[in-house]
Amino acid sequence: MAPRLQLEKAAWRWAETVRPEEVSQEHIETAYRIWLEPCIRGVCRRNCKGNPNCLVGIGEHIWLGEIDENSFHNIDDPNCERRKKNSFVGLTNLGATCYVNTFLQVWFLNLELRQALYLCPSTCSDYMLGDGIQEEKDYEPQTICEHLQYLFALLQNSNRRYIDPSGFVKALGLDTGQQQDAQEFSKLFMSLLEDTLSKQKNPDVRNIVQQQFCGEYAYVTVCNQCGRESKLLSKFYELELNIQGHKQLTDCISEFLKEEKLEGDNRYFCENCQSKQNATRKIRLLSLPCTLNLQLMRFVFDRQTGHKKKLNTYIGFSEILDMEPYVEHKGGSYVYELSAVLIHRGVSAYSGHYIAHVKDPQSGEWYKFNDEDIEKMEGKKLQLGIEEDLAEPSKSQTRKPKCGKGTHCSRNAYMLVYRLQTQEKPNTTVQVPAFLQELVDRDNSKFEEWCIEMAEMRKQSVDKGKAKHEEVKELYQRLPAGAEPYEFVSLEWLQKWLDESTPTKPIDNHACLCSHDKLHPDKISIMKRISEYAADIFYSRYGGGPRLTVKALCKECVVERCRILRLKNQLNEDYKTVNNLLKAAVKGSDGFWVGKSSLRSWRQLALEQLDEQDGDAEQSNGKMNGSTLNKDESKEERKEEEELNFNEDILCPHGELCISENERRLVSKEAWSKLQQYFPKAPEFPSYKECCSQCKILEREGEENEALHKMIANEQKTSLPNLFQDKNRPCLSNWPEDTDVLYIVSQFFVEEWRKFVRKPTRCSPVSSVGNSALLCPHGGLMFTFASMTKEDSKLIALIWPSEWQMIQKLFVVDHVIKITRIEVGDVNPSETQYISEPKLCPECREGLLCQQQRDLREYTQATIYVHKVVDNKKVMKDSAPELNVSSSETEEDKEEAKPDGEKDPDFNQSNGGTKRQKISHQNYIAYQKQVIRRSMRHRKVRGEKALLVSANQTLKELKIQIMHAFSVAPFDQNLSIDGKILSDDCATLGTLGVIPESVILLKADEPIADYAAMDDVMQVCMPEEGFKGTGLLGH
């Protein structure tokens, strides 16, 4: 099918030869494209919006043919949420609670701990009514033990694939969005659980934590002098093993028990010797628990960065661990079997994911617990290879060592759990108490009800989809109208009818109607012609309206469009005629004045008028029968002229002909008559028409004022030439010898006066000297002699006595300010005094200084500049200028600076394709001071960025801003200002002397190898509170 624009042209081509009064039914049907050939499926790739008979590509392809039932619904099979046979139940990750889920699964598979918790008394009896639980009440555990009871009961007998531990997490007060230290959580929770169970009367419950997890060791110190041995007994629930520098678990245990020498300042005070003596100290394992928890210290404190980091060291460990060589009392049973491996995925200590590999004590099979997902390992062997491959690669990482049979190695394992081997088989009959089982049954009933409800919803969706499938297959074949009676329906409604994701709404054709309540000819591109049979079914099933039959073809709109198109064709011819007439010179007084702007855009204005008559200006879109407008009519010109009608651009404010001949042009009478056909109401100005008399008077007055201003400016410039040119100016610090008196005016007066003298026709004349701004409310001077030679010199201008006499004649002076030099002493005067009139006001001067200092220290949203330095030598020169022995750099330094600047991304700034000249870092501070003197606006240089800061924000917060601007981590930033190093992160910028417009030098350390640490900088810079405020600490 031809493009849409060609179809539109073809539909109205007959209007070129048919007059409006000759329009017939055939012309109307052609305009509505009734008899265009319908498209064939397979030939037409997409729907032709210009052809109302094209019913291809409207969404029918998904309905033709066989359809899978699953496509009729978006509801997952509820059985996917059902627990598989002989599998375990997962736990939902509430955001960042994966570390909690791993420990819950490990503790759940400790059968002795689970059995003991089931024996704890519960408040669940309060919810019991006879033999059942109150249906209208939900059970809410009150204590940590009750939460664990309920969780373990669900993990044991729930029909769900995973359960929600939010009640347990909420009871502990944990932040679900904050990932915490898993090892610290384990310690704190075991302590909390032991304290909670200590109040139980049943000894099997009260002592379960000690029986399962508690061991004992002694700190043994031996005096080298007398040999006396002292012991300090201590209980432990896990052994914290250092892994740095080790490859095997046994090496870590040996280091833990290694003998330590106490010498020098660290000598031991021996009670037997009653003095400090050299000694040895070591740890002796006295007893080991049934469950031995070995914490591998992967997360350590980095002294260089001041933050935690993860050690990605490979550690080898065996499935069978014989602890007999490490305990003091031999002969017992100390052979342990690996039962769990807790894994941390990720290279950073502040992010990552926790999972657990746990051995089922009943079947001896290994399972991987990953929140909701639980995977059974093939066979009965632990498999860690996949977990190790998931870690991010690093250039410095070592190869994974080979492991023998029964051994494993990991760089992500942070805790190993071993179980004491016994001849007795584990208790396989841990029964859920009746009250807990009833709660589980109730939850299972809710789950089954949900499954049934979801299955019913799926069935309803499938049935509805099948019915829709049959409807579409039947009706789509009957949609083409052919020569039979037809109606029009919007393409959008048909597409929604064929869209299974949205419900079908009633047909609404109101947006397609013209002003005569019939089908608008311009809307035919968004309508489709369908058979009357299909339309009857649509309206009977879905309703809506109005129905657009053959009677809805609007003859009035077609006739009007025919008239407009013929006028547009005529406009094309007239446009060429007018252009030719404008080329000829206008003779005599037969011409007419036309605005130049109107002449440039008269055809567009005429088109807009025709489009307004047509009722739809958007359809023309600046085109006429396919021919575009002149490209020289820019958008800016049209925007300025769109508010004016034709020839109104030469009207003055009084409604008469404007006096500026540059804005208008004389055209011939023939050209004007052509233009007047399209703009009969346009203002008409024959060539003999006089310009506006009022505007002429105003123009003469303006010329007289300009002449007067020029005369005044010339007189003042001649009277004060040196003041205007800023030449031969007196200086307080080098008082001229030929005068003892100098006068003062404000620098603001001088600058405004110079503006007027330079451009007297644009600027207003200066009539008075306002020196009151330099005085306090008491009439005293606000500046000292010393300050006027330095920081306040930019506020005042010094005047010679001869110039002052001229200023008094030319201007009105409100206050006279002068400084007089007086020689003190009768003979050989050795001292010179400078006296100001009026005198200095000490109180106001002191107040001004205090206010200036306060403004410098108390600011908000002020601009400072950070300049990144890329050379160690140069930053030392800037920080300590006194070390500079030469003001120029050596050629070697210059050569070294170039590649550094090119490598740094903050220095790769282009300027029109040419390189910008680098400013020497050695002279950078002096350059900035010169810039400040030359201009009040700071001029940024390459490698520098502006930041908005406040005086009360800390240096650490500024470093965060610098990190975002330069991609340099705070711990890699070395900052200095005016040679002073900024190091106190807790100090505010105000106290550090950072004031608005300051320039801070940034030297970045070499980037760290672990780029993932940049992602954790924001978290690193936040104060680490751990489990503060949670139930683990008794809050």
From Swiss-Prot:
GO terms for molecular function: cysteine-type deubiquitinase activity; cysteine-type endopeptidase activity; deubiquitinase activity. Residues 618-629, 907-919 have a biased composition (Polar residues). The modification N6-acetyllysine is found at residue 956. Its main location: cytoplasm. Changing residue 98 to S: Loss of deubiquitinase activity. GO terms for cellular component: cilium; cytosol; mitochondrion; nucleoplasm; nucleus. Residues 612-640, 879-919 are annotated as: Disordered. It comes from the Eukaryota. The keyword Protease applies. Residues 89-421 form the USP domain. GO terms for biological process: protein deubiquitination; proteolysis; regulation of protein stability. The active site is at residues 98, 353. Residues 895-906 have a biased composition (Basic and acidic residues). Keywords: Acetylation, Cell projection, Cytoplasm, Deafness, Hydrolase, Non-syndromic deafness, Nucleus, Phosphoprotein, Protease, Repeat, Thiol protease, Ubl conjugation pathway. Belongs to the peptidase C19 family. This is Ubiquitin carboxyl-terminal hydrolase 48.
